[in-house]
Design a protein with these regions (language model features):
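Short acidic, hydrophobic short linear motifs in intrinsically disordered regions
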Residues: 26-35
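Short beta-strand "wing" residues that participate in macromolecule-binding interfaces
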Residues: 62
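Short, cationic-aromatic polyanion-contact patches
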Residues: 10, 65-85
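Amphipathic alpha-helical dimerization/coiled-coil segments
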Residues: 82-130
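Short capping segments at the starts of secondary-structure elements
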Residues: 19-27
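Short alpha-helical segments that sit at the start of domains
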Residues: 1-19, 78, 82
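Alpha-helical DNA-recognition elements
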Residues: 53
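Glycine-centered, phosphate/nucleic-acid-interacting loop/turn motifs that mediate DNA/RNA or nucleotide
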Residues: 58
Length: 133
């Protein structure tokens, strides 16, 4: 059952969503193997329980088996939607709603190469133009 008030995926749920966003549908065994390759060697029952919780939250959908008895899972939420909500929450809670402070904080913890800086400059130029219109 989903925890009340739990709008964002937990760390493990986010890892599973990333696996499903990369390639879906996936079975429990396939998800467990992908988690193990990423350094999370979990019991089969732990993965099943987590998938049930995620289905209850509406993050994933359990599909009926095609062949055999293995259920398959697909994401019900898009990566862009999850990242937008999580970033918005972070900006609100940590940076008091200031996007500028969040970007400054990002620059302090992440080194950017020239290509990333150029792309960010293009984005800022576009946003500046939109704000003036």
């Amino acid at each position: 059952m989903a925890r009340p008030g739990s709008h964002f995926p937990t760390e493990l749920e986010l890892e599973i969503l990333k696996i499903l966003w990369a390639s879906a549908p996936r079975t429990v065994s396939e998800i467990r193997e992908a988690l193990a390759l990423a350094g999370r060697d979990l019991a089969h029952t732990t993965v099943i329980t987590t998938l049930g919780t995620m289905a209850g939250k509406g993050q994933i959908e359990k599909l009926e088996p095609e062949v055999g008895k293995a259920f398959r899972f697909v994401p019900r939420v898009a990566h862009a939607e999850v990242s937008r909500h999580m970033l918005g929450d972070l900006v609100h809670r940590v940076f008091a709603g200031s996007a500028e402070a969040a970007v400054q904080g990002l620059f302090e913890v992440k080194d950017l190469d020239a290509t990333e800086i150029a792309r960010l400059r293009q984005l800022l130029n576009r946003k500046t133009k939109e704000a003036r219109e």
